[in-house]
Amino acid sequence: MGSEYKHILKSLCLSHGWSYAVFWRYDPINSMILRFEEAYNDEQSVALVDDMVLQAPILGQGIVGEVASSGNHQWLFSDTLFQWEHEFQNQFLCGFKILIRQFTYTQTIAIIPLGSSGVVQLGSTQKILESTEILEQTTRALQETCLKPHDSGDLDTLFESLGDCEIFPAESFQGFSFDDIFAEDNPPSLLSPEMISSEAASSNQDLTNGDDYGFDILQSYSLDDLYQLLADPPEQNCSSMVIQGVDKDLFDILGMNSQTPTMALPPKGLFSELISSSLSNNTCSSSLTNVQEYSGVNQSKRRKLDTSSAHSSSLFPQEETVTSRSLWIDDDERSSIGGNWKKPHEEGVKKKRAKAGESRRPRPKDRQMIQDRIKELRGMIPNGAKCSIDTLLDLTIKHMVFMQSLAKYAERLKQPYESKLVKEKERTWALEVGEEGVVCPIMVEELNREGEMQIEMVCEEREEFLEIGQVVRGLGLKILKGVMETRKGQIWAHFIVQAKPQVTRIQVLYSLVQLFQHHTKHDDLLS
């Protein structure tokens, strides 16, 4: 945004002959203060703009503050300076001493309000007459930039694109079924090319009659029964089983790809027993007599499966059989083919079925440790309970830096400090007092440690302590210590601050005087 403001200010200066342009914007912390946002200037006005950087006009005070408060622009010329002389004298403590020096060579100064965005100040070494075109162009350019949305979608474009969409009636999709949408053009088959041609007619007939045994099995089994089929079985006497289907067999239904004979599967279980039986006997006699305990298949379903004819061993080609057998069948299982199958080491153990949403696999140790550390951080960092992990880490870094600064400044505050000002009767004042009985309401002192200042100010009410703190923070000062003290029936705000090298004691005093005058006028109006 800074480059956009500078580009607009530059175009205003070049198009209308202004020597400099300064954009004053409302401070986000204290809306009563205007802060320096961006500027453009020529070589002659470099010093003027540099002096404006550290100024902070207050709303309703001074020319810039009055323009921001009233919303009416001001157009000043050097030949009418005598009309404003008294006001400039009053504005000396308000931070506008720079305007007096401007008129030594500046002919025109224009201060234009921008509504809620702020104020723009223009100056020129030439006499530029007031123009409605300049006012409208300046206001429109800067307000559009301030109110421009960032990273927001264009809703009009979105609705236009939605309006171009064509709506299709639901009847046009009635010809599609679930299997038609997700079926492959050429699904893999376990049958050899010779058997595909010979079985095409019978397969089509079975498809017409609806005798798809693979889907009969899935429809007759419940979800719990399917889990039991996939789990390791107890003592059973299983023989081989192959179910005749139309281009689908039990392995296709369960997602096993016959084109990958080296697929690694669990060495023990129902399907390994079935495959070992079919490989050893070279026959595929269909039988579900010993598997019926796993499911609630009714008598008609079992009868249909029992009467289904078996194919020869060509269902599993010989070259694929050797590879598959070595991977799927262990030595101890080969010896148990055709007999009673038992598990010696897991005979009396029953597996518990996993509940919905739970996983049997244990969480990795490193992931568990990370989750534990994040939980501890959320309890330690303020406002870290409901934020994301990225925000939590950012808050953690800021909190650590803050705690480190507390330890650093705590040691410094324990050390005795002295003011750099000249002591007189054990008291130091930020400005001269005519007589000893007068108490100055504001004191700003520079301490013996570089960059540190002590600020003291009278508070009429306790709520003014927070306002003073906001003004101090608005000047870019870091508050190291802030307390309220009672002295002779008056409440004093006492601050020790860390200032940047470019901030002077006089500038801090100017801002506090403005705040003090604002409260004084407010009290006079109430009284």
From Swiss-Prot:
It holds the Pfam family bHLH-MYC_N. Disulfide bonds: none annotated. Residues 295-318, 335-368 are annotated as: Disordered. GO terms for cellular component: nucleus. The keyword Nucleus applies. GO terms for biological process: cellular response to auxin stimulus; male meiotic nuclear division; meiotic cell cycle; metaxylem development; root development; seed development; xylem development. Residues 307-318 have a biased composition (Polar residues). Signal peptide: none annotated. Residues 343-368 have a biased composition (Basic and acidic residues). Residues 354-403 form the bHLH domain. Homodimer. Transcription factor that may regulate root development. PANTHER family: TRANSCRIPTION FACTOR BHLH155-LIKE ISOFORM X1-RELATED (PTHR46196), TRANSCRIPTION FACTOR BHLH157 (PTHR46196:SF2). This is Transcription factor bHLH157. It comes from Arabidopsis thaliana (Mouse-ear cress).
